[in-house]
């Protein structure tokens, strides 16, 4: 895996086009990304930053920081794990939908369940998912320790 902790001033980071940088890193790690997926990720970053002005979803405040420190980190699991086709994934403590939404965008075959205990974050993520027209993804407002009690969720996730 060739993911590094770059800053805007370091060589190789394209501050003008972080989506291009992300695509390059993905290709270097054997993951092809379509223009549609890049556009979806770009819209996700916009929506995340819009919602972040209302409620605290992520610590990073600039688009470049979100691309580098949230999007790239979220999808880096795809560089090291071969998630089986159609796998079910649970994102515990999703906050602003990270890493679940970027994973779903790049791997639409996955079934993704996002979980957060804070209702206002869940509402923000629901809005973002609806805006992106994502299917095969849901968000639940719950505490992780209560998840085994929920009908149909006990031991039903691959990752």
Regions found by a protein language model. Give the residues of each.
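Conserved SAM/SAH cofactor-binding pocket of Class I
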Residues: 75-159
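Class I SAM-dependent transferase core
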Residues: 2-85, 90, 127-137
């Amino acid at each position: 895996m060739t993911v590094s902790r770059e800053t805007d001033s370091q060589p190789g980071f394209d501050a003008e086009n972080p989506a291009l940088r992300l695509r390059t890193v993905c290709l270097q790690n054997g993951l092809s990304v379509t223009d549609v997926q890049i556009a979806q990720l770009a819209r996700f970053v916009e929506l995340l930053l819009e919602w972040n002005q209302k409620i605290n979803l992520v610590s990073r405040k600039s688009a470049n920081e979100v691309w580098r420190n949230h999007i790239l980190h979220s999808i880096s699991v795809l560089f090291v794990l071969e998630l089986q086709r159609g796998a079910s994934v649970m994102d515990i403590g999703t906050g602003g939908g990270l890493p679940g939404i970027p994973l779903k965008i790049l791997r639409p075959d996955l079934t993704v369940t996002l979980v957060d205990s804070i209702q206002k974050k869940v509402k923000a993520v629901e809005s973002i998912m609806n805006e992106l027209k994502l299917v095969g993804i849901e968000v639940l407002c719950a505490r992780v320790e209560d998840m085994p009690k929920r009908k149909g969720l006990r031991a039903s996730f691959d990752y």
